Amino acid sequence: MSNGIVIIGSGFAARQLVKNIRKQDASIPLTLIAADSMDEYNKPDLSHVISQGQRADDLTRQTAGEFAEQFNLRLFPHTWVTDIDAEAHVVKSQNNQWQYDKLVLATGASAFVPPVPGRELMLTLNSQQEYRACETQLRDARRVLIVGGGLIGSELAMDFCRAGKAVTLIDNAASILASLMPTEVSSRLQHRLTEMGVHLLLKSQLQGLEKTDSGILATLDRQRCIEVDAVIAATGLRPETALARRAGLTINRGVCVDSYLQTSNADIYALGDCAEINGQVLPFLQPIQLSAMVLAKNLLGNNTPLKLPAMLVKIKTPELPLHLAGETQRQDLRWQINTERQGMVARGVDDADQLRAFVVSEDRMKEAFGLLKTLSM
């Protein structure tokens, strides 16, 4: 491959791919192009930066220059890719263009910001760059509103509370983690957040934000208002698909790929948060690691399909951590919940009494791997 492989993106997915390619081929040309600095950081750490008093620069693990030298790469940081000419095998920016033999989209996902009046006042914490832009405001804020009670919203609510801030969490669902598990399973964490002092506004909706002399006025439904110093949107991620769409690739929720991570164009692949693998968007570390291993082989001439095992998802709420696996969001499961002082084990079984999902907490998390082996896929 004279032009080699071009990767758009520099996050966890792109880096895992580079490492796996270099294990097998030390010399194939690798070019990475990304809009950010390309410095490496651990994205899950963003859920704990406030309580740990970390600045954005503290998160950097490896600079772009060190990364390029270690893995023999051409890097183009702070570069926006504007177009892909799939027929000519060319990637274009405003001032440059790159030929490729194989192209990988690892463009990630962006935080969804609810379309309410004053939405520009909402902050997002989906990257080191985003945290850098708002770290002073977040550090100084005494009153924080978190919009969204999912995985990230719950982690942030606990972290800000542990940092001594007055935290309000709003969600239109009846319980936290509603898209991941039923109320009877999430209630243990919900109770712990309340005990810590997090003010939960469930079955509630944010209607607008307005800057005031003393902070930000948040207008809620049922004619309610609260004043805060910072508002964080934690309402989910949207795969970055605009570039793929302009290139004529098949798009659904993400960039559609098959079991080989190949898009609708034979020489273009997608990986990580931007990819939709056989109809599934899987924005978690383990499936990305496994996908990167398979894709590295396929880019180098193999024909290996991705086979994902049952995998754990970790909710990093230190006062009450959770691990979950399986189809925890299924509505037709019967939940068998065993709760004791040191933790909880919740098993979701189907009509045939087959284990389809489970959630474990605290000291009972050590039972997760045993349960994983008995999970029906």
Swiss-Prot record:
Role played: One of at least two accessory proteins for anaerobic nitric oxide (NO) reductase. Reduces the rubredoxin moiety of NO reductase.
Name of protein: Nitric oxide reductase FlRd-NAD(+) reductase
Gene encoding the protein: norW
Source organism superkingdom: Bacteria
Catalysis: reaction(s): 2 reduced [nitric oxide reductase rubredoxin domain] + NAD(+) + H(+) = 2 oxidized [nitric oxide reductase rubredoxin domain] + NADH
Family designation: Belongs to the FAD-dependent oxidoreductase family.
EC annotation from Swiss-Prot or TrEMBL: 1.18.1.-
Keyword match Oxidoreductase: yes
GO cellular component, one term: cytoplasm
Protein keywords: Cytoplasm, FAD, Flavoprotein, NAD, Oxidoreductase
Pathway entry: Nitrogen metabolism; nitric oxide reduction
NCBIfam families: PRK04965.1 (NF003437)
Matches recorded under SUPFAM superfamilies: FAD/NAD(P)-binding domain
Localization per record: Cytoplasm
Gene3D superfamilies to which the protein is assigned, alphabetical: 3.30.390.120, FAD/NAD(P)-binding domain (3.50.50.60)
Database matches in InterPro entries: FAD-bd_OxRdtase, FAD/NAD-bd_sf, FAD/NAD-binding_dom, NO_rdtase_NorW, Rbx-bd
HAMAP family: NorW
One Pfam family linked to the record: Rbx_binding
Molecular function per GO: oxidoreductase activity, acting on iron-sulfur proteins as donors, NAD or NADP as acceptor
Cofactors named for this entry: FAD
Gene source species: Escherichia coli O6:H1 (strain CFT073 / ATCC 700928 / UPEC)
